[in-house]
Amino acid sequence: MALNYIWFFFFIIAFAIALGKWIITGDPMIFKTITEGIFKSANDSVDLSFKLIGIMTLFLGFMNIGEKAGAIRFLSRLVAPFFSKLFPELPPKHPAYGHMMMNFSANLLGLDNAATPFGLKAMESLQTLNPNKETASNAQIMFMVLHASGLTLIPISIIAMRASITPPAANPTDIFIPCMIATFAATVAALTIVSIRQKINLLQPVILAWIGGISLLIGLLIAYLKIFLSQVQIESFSTVLSNGLILLIFLVFLTGGMYKKVNVFESFIEGAKGGFEIAIKIIPYLVAMLVAISVLRTSGAFEFITDGLKMVFSYFGMDTQFVSALPTAMMKPLSGSGSRAMMVDTMTTYGADSFAGRLSAIFQGSSDTTFYVIAVYFGSVGIKNTRYSIPSMLLADFVGIVTAIFVAYLFFGN
């Protein structure tokens, strides 16, 4: 029911702000701007769904080969000791373990194109165990909130954007560690929030061992990149690692399929058909969500909020540099492309190496696009009652935002 009220209030807030602008400033174009944005977002939603068809068919085709080759079962057995504690509803060795692990791994490496198909497959697997098909299960909520926290090891696209902006950042990779800290804080917050709600004990030895091990690996990788590699080498390493792993996954699935005497071509076609069906199924959910977000954005709601915050912090004599980057943080839960545009606008206006420019990049890398994730993932399996998933995601996003601000002042503050 939370999504119902949020969707409604997006329109109410946008209309109230637009009406205020028209009455106070006499802006005759505000309603035209909002209406044009509505129709553009509706068309963009359909275009986005069609763009997803190719990616979905590709990865679900290979995923089907991997399942028949036994790769997903192997991955499920590997992570079962850890995931069985976080997802107690799932039976041992369930395929959903492997699908979720593939999704988290793709997210970790910044492989958005791969993460979405793997995540949708995970939701489909979890839905088979869901007793109430229109209400999100505990396992689905845990998966969604962890996914939306957006734990990413190497923010490749953000580094590339900082390098390509005019003028470019002197050191595009200097936001690497701050991004890692912010997104890690958001993920830990997401895990803690849902675990408290679902009464999961995070102090179990297995959970502590896995979280400690993952934290150690991340720390060692960060140390290696910062101590032994130059800026150019870091960018090269990131590109080779992320793209090389995609090809390696495909090769492992194909080799495993041939070894198991699976007809890999027919298996690919069989799995790929599901990608088309899912992409078409999510169109209504995407249209509904992206139109509501467009209404809020084109009404000027973000400018209204940031101007108000700047006045409040100035009144108390506090530093307001971070406020200039807040539009990126506010847009990120709503729209990935919108927040990316906000980040570019901030870097163009203030400079890529300015405090606001760097902080906007950290905001962009600190979490995933919450409402897009809700629309696509829950929409793909027909979930209508998302229960407490949205408040949990937004709270984790808030932790990521606050952490990003503190980290930015720690690394780049004057």
Language-model features: locations:
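Hydrophobic core segments of alpha-helical transmembrane domains in multi-pass membrane transport
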Residues: 7-22, 56-64, 149-152, 156-160, ...
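Transmembrane helix-loop junctions in multi-pass membrane proteins
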Residues: 19-34, 67-72, 153-170, 196-198, ...
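Short hydrophobic/aromatic segments of transmembrane alpha-helices and their interfaces
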Residues: 97, 134-137, 247-248, 322, ...
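Alpha-helical transmembrane segments of multi-pass membrane proteins, especially transporters
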Residues: 6, 10, 32, 69, ...
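Residue-level preference for alpha-helix termini and adjacent loops
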Residues: 103, 108, 145, 153, ...
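Membrane-embedded alpha-helical segments and adjacent helix-loop junctions characteristic
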Residues: 31-128, 231, 260-349
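Membrane-core helix-loop-helix motifs of multi-pass transport proteins
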Residues: 126-218, 353-364, 369-414
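Hydrophobic transmembrane alpha-helices of multi-pass small-molecule transporters
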Residues: 1-49, 194-280, 413
